[in-house]
Amino acid sequence: MTVKTRASIAKKIEKDGLDSQYLFMDPNEVLQVQEESKKIPYKMEIVWRNVALFAALHVAAAIGLYELVFHAKWQTAVFSFALYVFSGFGITAGAHRLWSHKSYKATTPMRIFLMLLNNIALQNDIIEWARDHRCHHKWTDTDADPHNTTRGFFFTHMGWLLVRKHPQVKEHGGKLDLSDLFSDPVLVFQRKHYFPLVILFCFILPTIIPVYFWKETAFIAFYVAGTFRYCFTLHATWCINSAAHYFGWKPYDTSVSAVENVFTTVVAVGEGGHNFHHTFPQDYRASEYSLIYNWTRVLIDTAAVLGLVYDRKTIADEFISRQVANHGSEESRKKSIM
């Protein structure tokens, strides 16, 4: 299916009630970006500082993995796993489903909780993360997409963080309306104090807690609960940009690169239903996977029971079925309802 064909499909989707603001791909703008890119001479410029920092991180993570396997106390292993899961929620339930897509609403205490979890993940402040993610959805697989899959698996996975952004990313990202993000005092606070927050939550507390509560050595605590856990969480998130656009099936829209991928659903705490998500980005569930796989939905639903979350947006099953019949694959959909 061509992008031009998707333009007519998009009109049909909007008429059926799917608000496009937060955000599914705008086919007409995709065509425009593709034409503009042909006129822009571009050569990737490596940011060597980032290369050095990520290289150092992976060396530290390798040390952490060794210490985890051979020397760390079991409490440190459990603690590191908990940090990985909850920092993941700071991305999936927070930066992604709440702030990037507005797929549900949360009370101030819940927003503060998710912001604090997001600091453990250290993946840029939420405003910047959401801006890049909205670019990714609105101009998927073009030069305005920060992790454009047409540039290869490594670029999509982490290479995009090692080079300067394409001019189209800067130009079109600057046109997005981010007033909803800048009007949230929780996000403004995080952005203003981001460096001390992430140093405290991503590295200092993960080191101090094991040392204080179960007498782990500071060396092991830092490298296991700090650097290894952080690096593993990064790759789990990056797998959504890479593996979830390359390896899997397409039940809901065969024209997009995003796929359903069970592995990424597991490692990214519920984000692997990516073909569903790119087709219905405002659905807070982000997939049709069962709760066994969609831990982020479990968190959001639990918070709703506690009165911390409300106005969870979903797409009607009849509309999903119609979308599958017209533009997807019913046989593939069966794999996504597990």
UniProtKB/Swiss-Prot annotation:
It catalyses: octadecanoyl-CoA + 2 Fe(II)-[cytochrome b5] + O2 + 2 H(+) = (9Z)-octadecenoyl-CoA + 2 Fe(III)-[cytochrome b5] + 2 H2O; hexadecanoyl-CoA + 2 Fe(II)-[cytochrome b5] + O2 + 2 H(+) = (9Z)-hexadecenoyl-CoA + 2 Fe(III)-[cytochrome b5] + 2 H2O; heptadecanoyl-CoA + 2 Fe(II)-[cytochrome b5] + O2 + 2 H(+) = (9Z)-heptadecenoyl-CoA + 2 Fe(III)-[cytochrome b5] + 2 H2O; (11E)-octadecenoyl-CoA + 2 Fe(II)-[cytochrome b5] + O2 + 2 H(+) = (9Z,11E)-octadecadienoyl-CoA + 2 Fe(III)-[cytochrome b5] + 2 H2O. The keyword Transmembrane helix applies. Induction: Expression is regulated by nhr-80 and nhr-49. Keywords: Fatty acid biosynthesis, Fatty acid metabolism, Lipid biosynthesis, Lipid metabolism, Membrane, Oxidoreductase, Transmembrane, Transmembrane helix. It comes from the Eukaryota. It is a multi-pass membrane protein. Its EC number is 1.14.19.-, 1.14.19.1. GO terms for cellular component: endoplasmic reticulum membrane. It is found in: Membrane. Pathway: Lipid metabolism; monounsaturated fatty acid biosynthesis; Lipid metabolism; fatty acid metabolism. GO terms for molecular function: iron ion binding; stearoyl-CoA 9-desaturase activity. PANTHER family: ACYL-COA DESATURASE, DESATURASE 1, ISOFORM A-RELATED. Belongs to the fatty acid desaturase type 1 family. Cytochrome b5 CYTB-5.1 is specifically required for the desaturase activity, its knockdown or mutation alters the enzyme activity. The histidine box domains may contain the active site and/or be involved in metal ion binding. Delta(9)-fatty acid desaturase that acts preferentially on stearoyl-CoA (octadecanoyl-CoA) producing the monounsaturated oleoyl-CoA ((9Z)-octadecenoyl-CoA), one of the most abundant monounsaturated fatty acid in Caenorhabditis elegans phospholipids and triacylglycerols. This is Delta(9)-fatty-acid desaturase fat-7. It comes from Caenorhabditis elegans.
